[in-house]
UniProtKB/Swiss-Prot annotation:
GO terms for biological process: ascospore wall assembly; chitin biosynthetic process; septum digestion after cytokinesis. The lineage of its organism: Eukaryota, Fungi, Dikarya, Ascomycota, Pezizomycotina. The keyword Transport does not apply. Keywords: Cell membrane, Cell wall biogenesis/degradation, Glycoprotein, Glycosyltransferase, Membrane, Transferase, Transmembrane, Transmembrane helix. It comes from Pyricularia oryzae (strain 70-15 / ATCC MYA-4617 / FGSC 8958). The gene is CHS3. This is Chitin synthase 3.
Length: 902
């Protein structure tokens, strides 16, 4: 078979091949000097033996070529590279098949090519006589008929095959760029016509930093069409070592969204060709870290091929391997098995496989600074592998930007994945997190959206306007602040800044809204939903919340301390007043979060002590109070001990016991509150008080206020949002685990402020020693001659010829790490002590304990009781006011949404 150029009148099959160029003509992509590759089955000037079997592959825009025809002059065409992940199937192809990842894994760490072929013969003779115009093709027709005996074929193929000819691949603009034909098994599953974006995968070996990608003349396929494609939506899926099920879950949701937008023919932006305006970027954090099964799935989609990547280009190490392909293969999940479905909606895929593990923020830098600068998209959507967007959620996110020109960022509702029939709700940890997520999306996010500033747009599912992210001409701006956290390593990084950048998405939100001379706002889009897995074990939950709590706490302090930056923005006076109100609200919330552990103990102490009253439980109440106080103290001390010196992974049973202890304590608290309230109401009823008189009773008013400010507002807001089911399926679990959130998670987070890790570590490699080149068993090395020996000797003499001056040596990386860790531990001690002392002081002042009763010995019991009552009233009224404020904001969001439609 042969490759023929399509729609090219310049090529005449009746003429013999003439490599000499006509005078005054330079090569062009449409009419190259070489009119075709001379193949054994179709020499120059003659058609093949079977012209029907010729595969037409376009080589550039011809006279009648559509505007989206690719130009292949920007890449070196590599034909028929080995594809080990697939076995040829007799009798055609199956409509559906699963990925076989083991073959990819077995061959993944093999060298990318074999410089010295094992076989004695090559397809075209000796390598020294290889014709430069011949493509890398095996002698056998790779697109021919398949073997009728698959077992025999498998034996012949053996392991991973490497083509016998080693060719010199020219560089384009100093960069290695290859256009590689996709496997025949993949190609024949869908109609591809003349589009080489379907027939070829493009590989680029990036040998630069993401910030230099554009300047180093790297480009992407969308800019290589005759009419470069405009990118409206640029979607990134970041992953580390997620398996193929989690990855497929995300990609299925993305594919459904693209299909939904292609089915909107009346839209001015979308329609049948909408997929050309959408690029899906997959960034994997580390070549050694990627899950081999996920890598095999990417190969199944056509966007990855084994054996193509190169470690170095001209002695420059490759930093990222970039694969581009427009796939027509879909996916389906059946019983946690991924199946590939052919003939689906085309999707432009960009797969970036980073050479080293450099954390998620570096993956985002590749997305924004490298690829975003090339494509210049309108809207960027951020997804984590494992988060499944709803069938039209990405469209609704985009619509929010379309309706509001000043919207710089938007997020949707993050849902906890509950499994089939809600089976995951049987796990109390999942149910409690489900309730937490729901109430945050019903009260917190709508309130912040009503003001125009959302404290955090979750990186798992959010979107940004690309132009709003850009830095100013001085290099300062949102992206500059966002990526500053990537460089924080070593003792020079302060613990405050290091913890703050554990929640770098919060910093990005703050920098967007306060951008100089701009008036960008952030919005919450309830119509956009994304499902994600939540931790289902205590160990995973503790580790996750450590980063969340520390990052959000220090980022909130940063935002409050830099509130003055709002005045550099171009927001209106009333918008700035609204921001001031919101930040005041956030400050009050942060103060309550700081004193949460002290407030919880005070409520516990007051209620359990009250049960010892003679009108209630009397002596029994006193005994129970002492027992539960001891249980409380032991549990809290245990939490501190575990947090200060143990890893959660090695203390799972202890933390599980703590969860049960705190749940028992909460049950006793709930019993005390209900019992005291019922006794008070019964006493009032026996005195014959009317309803108006009952409402004047302090106990009754406190009871009603506390219930309505929490459960009442939760229920009403959930009903108004048409999402009340979590109140019936997850409320009890959340109540039982709320002491765990307050005590266990907060204690572990504050006791580990020195730990600024994300849970993943980079691949630190030792420095390489000078190498020795060997040939025929003999090594070559640079050895000094006599003159060099003399020079070196004189230099040694000069070292001690003068007085010794103390030289400050740079610390080694291990010493820097140890110094940094010691510094962080010291600051951790100060933070924990300050936190404990302030909370203990609050409890001592309210209860007149810890020696304060000796300072004021004349204080009677009635005064102490009155002080405790006043404190309880302040707490309850504050909680009620904060909840009411959230409710008002959520209602305003609901009213605005009725008119906006999003």
């Amino acid at each position: 078979m042969a490759y023929n150029r399509l729609d090219d009148d310049y090529f005449d099959n009746r003429r013999p091949m003439n490599n000499r160029p006509p005078p005054h003509r330079t090569p062009s992509p449409g009419h190259p000097l070489q009119h075709g590759y001379q193949l054994d089955d179709a020499p120059y000037g003659r058609p093949g033996l079977n012209s029907a079997s010729n595969l037409d592959i376009p080589m550039g825009p011809g006279r009648h070529t559509p505007s989206d025809q690719l130009q292949l002059h920007t890449a070196h065409s590599m034909a028929n590279m080995s594809e080990p992940g697939y076995q040829q199937q007799p009798g055609g192809y199956r409509d559906e098949y699963s990925v076989n990842p083991e073959q990819h894994h077995d061959a993944y760490y093999n060298p990318t090519y074999t410089p010295t072929p094992n076989e004695a013969q090559t397809p075209y003779g000796e390598p020294g006589y290889e014709h430069d115009g011949r493509p890398l093709l095996p002698q056998q027709d790779s697109y021919g008929q398949y073997s009728d005996n698959p077992q025999q074929q498998q034996q012949q193929q053996g392991g991973l095959k490497r083509w016998k000819t080693v060719k010199r691949v020219p560089l384009y603009m100093g960069n290695l760029v290859l256009d590689c034909p996709v496997p025949p098994k993949l190609l024949n599953q869908f109609p591809h016509g003349e589009r080489d974006e379907f027939t070829h995968m493009r590989y680029s070996a990036a040998t630069c930093d993401p910030n230099d990608f554009y300047d180093e003349k790297f480009t992407l396929r969308q800019r290589l069409f005759s009419k470069p494609r405009e990118t409206e939506l640029f979607i990134v899926v970041t992953m580390y070592n997620e398996d193929e099920v989690l990855f497929a879950r995300t990609m299925i949701g993305v594919f459904k969204n693209i299909e939904y937008m292609c089915k909107r023919p009346e839209s001015k932006t979308w329609g049948k060709e909408a997929w050309k305006k959408i690029v899906v970027c997959i960034v994997s954090d580390g070549r050694a870290k990627i899950n081999p099964r996920t890598r095999a799935l990417l190969a199944g989609l056509g966007v990855y091929q084994e054996g193509i990547a190169r470690q170095n280009v001209d002695d420059k190490p490759t930093t990222a391997h970039i694969y581009e392909y427009t796939t027509q293969i879909g996916m389906a999940l059946k019983n946690d098995v991924v199946q590939l479905l052919p003939r689906q909606q085309p999707v432009q895929l960009l797969f970036c496989l980073k050479e080293n593990n450099q954390k998620k923020i570096n993956s985002h830098r590749w997305f924004f600074s490298a690829f975003g600068r090339v494509l210049n998209p309108n809207i960027c959507v951020l997804l984590d592998a494992g988060t499944k967007p709803g069938g039209n959620s990405i469209y609704h996110l985009w619509k929010a930007f379309d309706l509001e020109p000043m919207c710089a960022g938007a997020c949707g509702e993050i849902k906890a994945m509950l499994g089939t029939g809600g089976k995951n709700l049987f796990n109390p940890l999942v149910a409690a997190q489900n309730f937490e997520y729901k109430m945050s999306n019903i009260l917190d996010k709508p309130l912040e959206s009503a003001f125009g500033f959302i404290s955090v747009l979750p990186g798992a599912f959010s979107a940004y306007r690309y132009i709003a992210l850009q830095n100013d001409k001085n290099g300062q701006g949102p992206l500059e602040k966002y990526f500053a956290g990537e460089k924080l390593h070593g003792a020079g990084a302060g613990i405050f800044t290091a913890n703050m950048y554990l929640a770098e998405d919060r910093i990005l939100c703050f920098e967007l809204v306060t951008k100089r001379n701009c008036h960008w706002i952030l919005q919450y889009v309830k119509s956009a939903t994304g499902e994600t897995d939540v931790p289902d074990t205590a160990t995973e939950l503790i580790l996750q919340r450590r980063r969340w709590l520390n990052g959000s706490f220090f980022a909130a302090i940063y935002a409050i301390a830099h509130f003055y930056q709002f005045f550099r923005s171009d927001h209106s006076f009333f918008r700035k007043i609204a921001f001031f109100i919101e930040f005041t609200f956030n400050t009050v919330n942060m103060i309550f979060a700081w004193f949460a552990i002290g407030n919880f103990f005070l409520v516990f102490k007051i209620l359990t002590t009250s049960l010892g009253d003679e009108t209630l439980l009397g002596t029994t109440g006193k005994i129970l109070g002492v027992c539960f106080e001891w249980l409380y103290g032991v549990s809290l001390i245990t939490c501190f001990v575990l947090a200060m010196g143990n890893r959660p992974a090695g203390s799972g049973p202890y933390y599980l016991a703590m969860i049960y202890f705190w749940a028992i304590i909460f049950c006793y608290l709930l019993f005390a509150a209900v019992f005291i309230s019922v006794k008070a109401i019964m006493a009032d009823a026996q005195r014959g008080l009317s309803v108006p008189e009952l409402l004047k009773d302090q106990v009754v008013v406190t009871l009603i206020l506390s219930i309505m400010s929490t459960y009442g507002i939760w229920l009403v807001a959930s009903l108004l949002m048409f999402d009340p089911w979590h109140m019936f399926t997850s409320l009890v679990q959340y109540m039982l685990l709320s002491p765990t959130f307050t005590n266990v998670l907060n204690v572990y987070a504050f006791c580990n402020t020195h730990d600024i890790s994300w849970g993943t570590k980079g691949d630190d490699k030792p420095d390489k020693l000078p190498s020795v080149s060997t040939k025929d068993g003999a090594g070559k090395a640079d050895l000094p001659d006599e003159a060099d020996l003399n020079t070196m000797y004189e230099r040694e003499l000069a070292v001690f010829a003068q007085k010794h001056v103390e030289e400050k040596k740079a610390l080694t990386p291990s010493q820097l790490d140890e110094k940094q860790l010691d510094y962080y531990r010291g600051v951790r001690t100060v933070v924990v002590l300050l936190w404990m002392v302030t909370n203990f002081g609050l409890a001592a002042v309210v209860l007149s304990t810890a020696g304060l009763d000796r300072i004021t010995p004349n204080t009677n019991a009635e005064t102490k009781e009155q002080r405790a009552t006043i404190y309880m009233a302040v707490v309850l009224y504050s909680v009620a006011a904060l909840s009411g404020f959230k409710f008002i904001g959520a209602m305003w969001f609901l009213v605005v949404r009725m008119f906006r439609g999003v």
